[in-house]
């Protein structure tokens, strides 16, 4: 392999988020991300710098990091994700207070539509999509999110994971 000191590559990443509040505490949220990376000259791209997409924080309804290029592992009989040098992710989420919760804004329901994928050297822009529902709670320990995602465009090799849990921020 190539010693780490000889690896030369670049990464470009951008993210855009927009939130719009409506009456009665309803919020429409958008998240968009793109990333691209490439090695210089004849140097190989370090696979440890690959992007991964799938799961909460990217495309819910799929297992974390499972989308994009894969290889078939003959030892386990499963497809393993390899990540990719480019990624695209888009999330649209509509959040409402839980009916009957009154002034308590810590518990909220949301619906979402997600799309995205990662790519190797060939970018073909085939996206995976999902939609679903979830519950978020601003707990004393921080934000918690539970979501149930349903893939729209999945392949037999995709690792589907419908129920997911997240600790942390909105996207």
What role is predicted for each listed range?
Residues 106-109, 114-116, 139, 170:
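Flexible, small/polar- and glycine-enriched "cap/hinge" segments at structural transition points
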Residues 135-139, 160-171:
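Outer-membrane beta-barrel "beta-signal"
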Residues 1-102, 106, 119-121, 157, ...:
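C-terminal outer-membrane beta-barrel translocator/porin domains of Gram-negative envelope proteins
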Residues 30-32, 92, 109-113, 135, ...:
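Membrane-embedded beta-strand positions of outer-membrane beta-barrel proteins
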């Amino acid at each position: 392999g190539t010693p780490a000191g000889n690896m030369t590559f670049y990464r470009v990443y951008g993210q855009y988020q927009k939130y719009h509040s409506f009456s009665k505490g309803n919020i429409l949220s958008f998240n968009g991300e793109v990333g691209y990376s490439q090695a210089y000259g004849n140097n190989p791209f370090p696979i440890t710098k690959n992007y991964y997409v799938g799961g909460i924080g990217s495309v819910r309804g799929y297992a974390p990091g499972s989308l994009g290029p894969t290889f078939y592992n003959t030892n386990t009989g499963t497809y393993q994700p390899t990540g990719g040098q480019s990624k695209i992710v888009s999330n649209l989420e509509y959040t409402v207070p839980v009916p009957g919760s009154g002034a308590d804004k810590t518990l909220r329901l949301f619906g979402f539509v997600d799309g995205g994928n990662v790519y190797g050297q060939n970018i073909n822009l085939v996206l995976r999509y999902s939609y679903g529902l979830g519950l978020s709670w601003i707990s004393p320990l921080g934000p918690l999110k539970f979501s149930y995602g349903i893939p729209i465009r999945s392949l037999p090799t995709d690792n589907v994971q419908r129920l997911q849990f997240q600790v942390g921020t909105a996207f």
